[in-house]
Amino acid sequence: MQQLEHVRFPEEAGISSQGILNYIAAREAAGLEHHAIWVMRHGKVAAKLNYAPYDDHTPHMLFSLSKSFCSAAAGFVVQEGLLSWDSKVIDVLPEAAPEQPSEWLSSVTLHHLLCMGSGLKVESDGIRSGTDWARRALACDCDHAPGTHFHYNSTGTYLVSCMVQKVTGMTVRDYLIPRLFVPLGMMAEGGAAPEWDCSPDGVNMGGWGLYLSCEQIAPFGQCLLQKGMWDGKQVLPREWIDRATTAQIDNGNGEHPHDHDWNMGYGYQFWMCKTDHEPGQTPRYRGDGALSQFVIVDEKRDMVVCCVSGVPDIGKALGLMYEHLFAAADMPPADESVQAVLQQKLTELSYPWPTHDGSDLPVGVYVAEEENVMMTIDSNQVGLPMPNGEIAQFTPGCVARVGNTMSCCGMQDGALHLLLRMPSKPFTVDVAICFDDEGDATLILSGIGPDPRTIHMKKIA
């Protein structure tokens, strides 16, 4: 089986060590929290950036990067003759169709769903609870003729998942096991298939919900670069790749500059990227997900970059990668001293945990009645409820792992700092706590919701 070759120094793959160092410095200066990054060129892994406590082998929530894998399933279904790009949604899913579908809804095809040109109304993309998701989405009807307007719609990708499951009798995940995950060596440790969340109707989400590690994403990106070839065989359908990775619809809406990364065209669940290539040259494209989950393919440079992250500003994350990681392929080789600096730096990549000055914790029970939140502090542990209802425990000066969470706390100058990380998810809960003269507490919570929250808590015991 074809394996990705791991080289000792980036220069062996045509990448400058100095370019990688430039990226590491730029990322740190920008405060972007990437978890794991692989940089590949000429089929070789030039550099792996793992920021502890994260790594490149733990499956990670991909958000909308899942869409690119659902698209691949559609490619296989078409190749096997079970559907065509022109298959109409209501013909494949008649049980979900309205009794009298409109002309526009009746003409929505697999192609339209894949290129985000279905014309389905915006409200169709808000279905995340209850059952009968497909029926409820199609009941929303269309507000544009299919193929005439780009509208990013994750429920549209869910409908693709429904179509694949209807004609194969298998979920998208199970369908991809022998066709993609096994041939590319993407199965998890012990041979387990990747996890992909399902709707209450038993259908893989399609547009989100897949968990893969950076190590698992990498061969998918390399196979795309190789036009579907892997180990001398055509694994991914070539026709699908040609469609998926070239613009199928104009996604410019006038809100961004003409060369903006979200204005360059959209394929089949892939975005066309900004590029420094001349017009008409080989493209750069990407699959991406919220908080900067990426697989980016640059055909001109014969290069793939994939990453899992917790970075809300996708544009800034992409910009630094273009400026430094892809540019590293255009730089002269670094000398041995720079290579040595990079190798040392790669062993030191990490995010800090709270430090503890050894002072006593402010023991007590604290409540915020308006928030219905209670915090307990004893001599060696802090308990604070999380949004999922579970009580997170924090130990001063000690990183503890329970299930999929890692936590630590520390006192510094009378203030308490709590930090919780989730190695398989892009979420970090950061809590700064100050105590007043009466012993009451003020919490500033970051990572729960888009903006920091301030909570005042009264000490009751």
Segment roles from a protein language model:
Residues 188, 193, 245-304:
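Active-site Gly/Thr loop motif
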Residues 287-353:
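Structured C-terminal helix/loop/strand segments within mature extracytoplasmic catalytic/sensor domains
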Residues 61, 80-118, 139, 167-207:
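Active-site helix/loop module of the DD-peptidase/beta-lactamase fold
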Residues 334-461:
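Peripheral terminal and inter-domain segments
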Residues 43, 61-86, 113, 160-164, ...:
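Active-site SXXK
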Residues 156-163, 208-229, 241, 293-310:
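Active-site-proximal alpha-helical segments within enzyme catalytic domains
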Residues 28-38, 51-95, 102-108, 144-152:
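Short active-site loop at a secondary-structure junction
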